[in-house]
Amino acid sequence: MDWARRVELVSVLVASAVAVAGLWYSNVQAQQALDQARQERALTKEGQITDRYTAAVSNLGADKMDVRLGGVYALERIMQDSPRDHSTIANVLATYIRLHAARPPAQGQDVPADVNAALTVLATRDSSHDGDFRLDLRSAWLSGTEIGRQVPYQPAVLAQADLRGTHLRGTKLGSADLRATNLSNADLRNADLTSTTLSRASLVKTDLRGAKLFAADLRHAFLTEAELSGTDLRSAEMRGARLPRADLSGSNLEDGNLRSADLEGADMSGSNLKGVDFTSASAGVSGANLTGANLTGANLNGADLSTVNKEHHGTPLVGVILDGANLEGANLADADLTGADLSHVKNLTRKQLDSARTDAETRLPAGLS
């Protein structure tokens, strides 16, 4: 290859290298420009959100209801647009509710619309952005509200909330998520809790008289000394629930599941216990008051009936309807069965009877008379 040809090739290579370098530099410049534009847009958006947040919070302090409502809904929109600000806004709305619902509404008045709106926003929020936020509505007066009902088919999310002493009488909470929520000493009289999830919730000394808990999930819930008289607990899932000294008198527990539940000292007098599963409630029914209860078809497999009604009446099972009840493995040691009607129970053995107290008035199944 002659010298001229070599010079030509070198020139081509140099030109190509310069072109590549130029393209690379242009690309770097373009990328830097894009990054800068992106940062500027982010800063602009952040500034806009800050301005929107400031305006919304300012509206919460307005005298007019419609302005305050606008502030609540503006905060909801910011919460949706900026997950980073989610927990801050949730805390603002919770504080707003506690401040504006610290006292009961005037007689004949409902919970204010702005408080109800803030409650709905919190109850229907995307809890995956909660971070360390925990809903705190202690002692708030929220009776009669329809939490989350403004959003069709979206149940309220109140899991792990602190609702101690909250006034929720007549509140509609159907299908709400209240897992591990603290409702101790709360007022839930006549509340609608149909199909609500209350597993591991704390309901210690909670007033649930007349509440609807049909098909509710109360697995391992804590209901010590809870007021449940006249409550609708049909088909409720109460496996492992703790109900010592709870008042269940006159309640309807038909077809409920009370496997391994603790009912020590509970008052179930006059309750409908048809088809209830008491399997393995070995420490459960001890000392409970079943006077006048209907246990037709109930499963008492392995349940401890040895001290049922002892603290309440001298003849524990008189008046208790046991038609078709399954007593397989039930502990009847020293149980007072005098005057009891056991003629239609299932799986009762002579060994169980020999450990209990009976008399001439005790009616036994055929074959055990």
Task: Go through each PLM region and give its residues.
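Membrane-proximal alpha-helical anchors
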Residues: M1-R98, K351
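Positions within the helices of HEAT/ARM-like alpha-solenoid repeats
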Residues: L9-S16, L34, D66-R68, D85, ...
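Hydrophobic core/packing positions within alpha-helical solenoid repeats
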Residues: L75, L93, V115, L119-L122
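Tandem repeat scaffolds
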Residues: G131-S369
